[in-house]
């Protein structure tokens, strides 16, 4: 995954540089752009699929920790937000070319992916208390630990600074 991500970022930078050059001297070499697009589409699709698989596994582990910390009083969700979820990347790249030329960077792709964290159906970053946000962060870290432990058959070291700050007494005791 890491090699694909590094290659994707390198090609993305090259594509963006070409888009910027075209803005200064409008003579875009479509042949070069098509080569970049072909590579970025292939790698983008691979990255997207690997992220989807990871999130499907990770969210189950994460939820189990959050249920434990919150004593099953709150529901939590992780949603993988990606332009590629319901779209063909080749079509997205093709359809966004004019916009990319105006903005001078690639506006569509897995580099725009994000995770949405919901607590009882609401975005936790907007509506969660500091204690709820801290509980979510602890659950994320514990899920990372468990995932790495199972996947790599190692015991990772987890550093948590001020772990009990902003937590109510019940959550601290758990």
How would you name each of these model-derived features?
Residues 25-159, 166-174:
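Conserved NTPase motor "head" modules and their coupling/switch loops across ABC/AAA+ ATPases, GTPases
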Residues 4-7, 58, 164:
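Residue-level detector of well-ordered alpha-helical segments, enriched
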Residues 1-19:
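Extended, charged alpha-helical "arm/stalk" segments used for dimerization and assembly
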Residues 18-21, 68:
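Amphipathic alpha-helical interaction surfaces
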């Amino acid at each position: 995954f890491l090699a694909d991500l590094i290659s994707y970022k390198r090609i993305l930078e090259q594509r963006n540089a070409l888009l910027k050059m075209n803005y200064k001297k409008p003579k875009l070499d479509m042949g070069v752009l098509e080569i970049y697009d072909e590579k970025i589409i292939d790698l983008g699709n691979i990255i997207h699929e690997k992220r989807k698989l990871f999130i499907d596994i990770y969210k189950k582990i994460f939820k189990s920790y959050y249920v434990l910390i919150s004593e099953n009083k709150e529901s939590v969700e992780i949603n993988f937000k990606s332009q590629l979820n319901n779209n063909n990347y080749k079509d997205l790249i093709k359809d966004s070319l004019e916009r990319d030329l105006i903005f001078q960077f690639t506006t569509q792709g897995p580099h725009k992916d994000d995770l949405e964290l919901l607590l009882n159906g609401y975005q936790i970053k907007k509506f969660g208390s500091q204690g709820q946000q801290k509980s979510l962060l602890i659950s994320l870290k514990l899920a990372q630990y468990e995932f790495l432990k199972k996947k790599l058959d190692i015991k990772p070291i987890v550093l948590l600074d001020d772990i009990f700050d902003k937590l109510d007494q019940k959550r601290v005791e758990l």
